[in-house]
Amino acid sequence: MFYYNDNRIKKRCALLMSIVLLVCLAAVLPMQVRAADAAIYPMYQRAVDFPQGDLSRLAQVIRKAQAGGEINIGFLGGSITEGRGAANVQDCYVSQVYKWWYEAFPLAQINVINAGVGGTSSYLGVHRVDAELLVHKPDLVFMEFAVNDTFTEFCMNSYENLIRKILMSESNPALVLLFATNAVGDSSQAVQAALGQYYDLPMISYGKAVTPEVEAGSFTWFQIAEDIVHPNNMGHSIFAGLITTYLEDLCAKLDTIEVDAARLQQYELPEPVTMQVYQNAHIENAATITPLEVLGYDVYDFNYHFGDNWYSMQDGSYISFVVEASNIGILYQRTVEGTFGQYDVYIDDQYVKTLDGNYVEFYGTETEAEELFASPDGGKAYHVIKIVKNPTSFNTDFVIIGLLVS
């Protein structure tokens, strides 16, 4: 149950209502001005219309902030979390949520780690979460992969592995699942929310909040988004407002939430639903692994987020590695520049697949993560990975960002 009788909740909902009304008025939509309850409460109630989840970890973070402690808040996700669509960094939902914490708890030291990377799924997330987020010992993590993950067993597996990694990390962080959506309402929310319920986690859905409003004509999708996926300033404000309203609600009922610190320290995860194959997942790059053989590749920081890449620009180039793993993937760059070619991957002398560095879009680049090998029995062994230019590829450029190893 959620309570709205606290003045802070009313103020937050009033802010959300003003956002929605500004969207509508900006387009001069033929609609009636609705009361606050009718305009906002349904949006917020839909957004949090999940089983409540275990709030003890989150309540512990709030109490630590109230006491003036240092709070590390992590955000893990794709381009929406990175801030795509917002005009400026301060306009993205992550910055707005940070501002709420900063203003709500002036005695606390609030640190935010934004580990959002555009175009990436939970498969890459489970390989990078240790180095990019968990190393900072977060007290609270917000995670959003609903748009970039697909309705597949593969993504369900990586998403659950990621949940377990975060919950069992050294700092015992609270974890809140976020679900974005796109213009046609597609997302992997159903699968991810089922896992969230299984692990008794708090959840907030931007999709459940805005999609019915778009369908009802309260506002159009492109009044809250810059394209079919990414929220604009207004969309980011709505997303942030849903999260901060949820936090206001939690503050209002904080005294009713019991926290057993000893039990949290001895927390044991329930049995996994999927195979646990990514618990030791990490990324190997040019700074951490030496090629077995290499010709025509230079070490270069091509990717703005992931440094120490291998970059080939010549015909006949090849590179090979030896890794001990039960699962092997690759992270490589795709671009619209028109100079990137196709490269073949072999593992233990067996052809696996062809990677296409050419990105068929109107603009930009894409950081592509693909699994190449999965051990049938989950056992580790040494494997040789070789990457060579496809003989039919006219273009020669190719960037290997790293190997995904677990």
Predicted regions and their residues:
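N-terminal secretory targeting modules
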Residues: 1-74, 81-88, 106-108, 237, ...
